[in-house]
Amino acid sequence: MAEGTDVRRETLRNFVANNLEITNAFYTHPKILVTALNGPAVGLSAALIAFSDFIYAAPHAFLLTPFTSLGLVAEGGASKAFVQRLGISKANEALIMSKRITAQEMLQVGFVNKIIQTGKNEQETFLAEVLKEVEDRLGNHLNNDSLVRVKALIRKPEREMMDGQTVAEVLGGLERFVSGIPQEEFRKIANGEKKHKL
């Protein structure tokens, strides 16, 4: 019994540490982060995208944060970053309702900078178009040091608040795991008792 408890405790400790570390790495990253979103972004990955400085999406891309459907709470700083980037209405749809947010919806609210018109099987074309856009917009005509200094100034007011929000999310997730709620939701999905929107 004690050995199983130790394994569970270690698993939870790793969950907390890894979640805090990866989220912190994204919202404190000093360089310009560009995301080329050429398909679905789900869960923690979707949350972390919100910390990108520029996001380019394919028309078929979408965000899905099924935290509430799985008995979890928001993670990856999404409870703050989504509100900032999507606006409160779309953030509520994404986080509370576990609603899929399409590329067009993301463009309308300013979550993405541009939709690159390519098909689902045109990954190479999509990447080439994103790289061309980045080179055109962030190329040699701009001073690299100024870019990162301006980013630091833009992000400075939210850093301390994000530290607290990320800890609150991780502790909320830990409480849910300890109570067994997500495990029960995953069991229902595995047994066909519950359909999921993925």
Residue ranges and their predicted role:
Residues 21-26, 36, 42-95, 129-130:
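CoA-thioester-processing core
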Residues 13-20, 43, 76, 100, ...:
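Glycine-rich phosphate-binding loop at the start of an alpha helix
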Residues 1-7, 24-35, 54, 58-62, ...:
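A structural preference for short, pocket-lining loop segments at secondary-structure junctions
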Residues 56-61, 112-168, 180, 192-197:
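C-terminal long alpha-helix characteristic of the crotonase
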Residues 19, 79, 88-91, 127, ...:
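A general structural signal for well-ordered alpha-helical segments in protein cores
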Residues 53-54, 93, 97-99, 105, ...:
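Well-ordered beta-strand positions
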